[in-house]
Amino acid sequence: MGIGFIQDKLEIKFLILYIAARVTEPLAPAEMQDLTMCDDGIDYFDYAECLNDLVKTEHLRLTEDGRYVITEKGLKNSQICESSLPYSVRQRSDKNIAAYNKEALRRAQVQSHVTERDNGTYTVTLALRDDVDELMELRLMVADRATADGLAQRFQQEPEKLYA
């Protein structure tokens, strides 16, 4: 394990709760790991053990689709213990969480979906939403799956090109 500001498993648990309390949506296992491994003092095996312990003690729970979400108990303990985290770790975590939340907001606002039709063609649905309502929805018929997937992916990457 590298030298870092996180010194023990209790601090890893505090960090996991700190992160879970600040994200805007439940986290997939890989996302939780990416956000937690922000300090050289954390190794994967300690992280995995701490994450499992937090689920067992009902500070976190797993959703039906395998994502982690903080419970009321976890939120309460996170608020009590967050000042125990080293300041530099909190700063780095806040930066990473802000970037994650920004990307999550974009995923919620820019959506695309491909469905196969009965005749073998595909419908690509492209939608833009804001916090309140749907701004735009466009459905396009395309001949093959590759074209449909490409169109959906390009819209996800640069929706402003279509909307402008």
Language-model features, listed with the residues they occupy:
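A short, conserved structural fragment
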Residues: V55-D65
